[in-house]
A protein has these predicted regions:
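Binuclear metal-dependent hydrolase catalytic cores
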Residues: 1-162, 167, 172-174, 229-252
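Cap/insert and terminal regions of metallo-dependent hydrolase folds
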Residues: 167-250
């Protein structure tokens, strides 16, 4: 797996940080997790071909995690170098079908192309993982919106977890259990509180309790661009800590 943080920012508009988007390139597929504003151009800047996407997964339905699906599909339909015939699978948490129906009711004429585009509604409790040619994808409820979930990818003995937006929760700890890399949000300042988001102390708690070996901090606004890694370390996490920027790449 090669993982690229295409968008490390938040709802706050910033020149240097796009909204949430993570691309996972496997041996045979390109997977995208969330598509916030600026994600499509962010893929280009990171050296990723937006037309190569095979699967899209959403963590929840806030615009800063979903809005660029419209320009992506618009581009695939009208601007691809060759007409697409390859399947594009789009998945999201229950009630994803309702969200998708509303979106396509407005934009469908310009989004839906002449290629297979199945949509998959994931129940909030993962019973059977999504099987791809190269990895298994599990998910679990997170503490942000009623529909919010995070994802866990397992491939070739390595585990990568992406929380999406969340506060502390036992299900989040379980999702991140013994992960090689935990990509985790930090939308609240040290000692502060923003409902549905984590402080550096919360990041450290989840990372420590789960036994994650490495933490990559993402989804933080400009006013939190202090030394987040030092704050997470001071809160008790002893593993490796990285702070994501747009274009940060790593393997689990």
């Amino acid at each position: 797996l090669e993982i690229t943080v295409v968008g490390s920012g938040t709802v706050l508009p910033e020149l240097e940080r796009r909204q949430s988007c993570v691309v996972v390139e496997t041996a045979s597929e390109t997977l995208v997790f969330d598509l916030g504003s600026g994600a499509v151009r962010g893929m280009l800047r990171a050296g990723i071909d937006p037309f190569s996407v095979d699967r899209i997964f959403f963590t929840h339905f806030h615009p800063d995690h979903t809005v660029d699906v419209v320009p992506l599909l618009f581009a695939i339909k009208y601007a691809a170098r060759e007409p697409r015939d390859r399947k594009l699978v789009i998945s999201g948490p229950e009630p994803f079908h309702r969200f998708w129906a509303a979106l396509t009711n407005v934009w469908g004429e310009w989004m839906v192309g002449d290629y297979p585009m199945p949509t998959v509604q994931l129940p909030l409790a993962c019973r059977v993982p999504v099987e791809t040619p190269d990895c298994q994808i599990f998910w679990a409820k997170t503490e942000h919106r009623p529909e919010s979930i995070g994802y866990r990818l397992e491939a070739a003995g390595k585990t990568f977890v992406y929380t999406g937006d969340t506060a502390y929760g036992e299900s989040v700890v379980a999702l991140a259990r013994n992960a090689d890399t935990l990509l985790i949000e930090c939308g609240a300042p040290a000692g502060g509180e923003v409902p549905g988001h984590l402080t550096p102390e919360g990041v450290a708690r989840i990372a420590s309790e789960s036994g994650a070996r490495r933490v990559v901090i993402t989804h933080f606004p400009a006013f939190l661009q202090t030394d987040l890694a030092a704050e997470v370390r001071a809160a008790g996490y002893e593993g490796e800590i990285l702070t994501a920027e747009d274009g940060t790449k790593f393997s689990p």
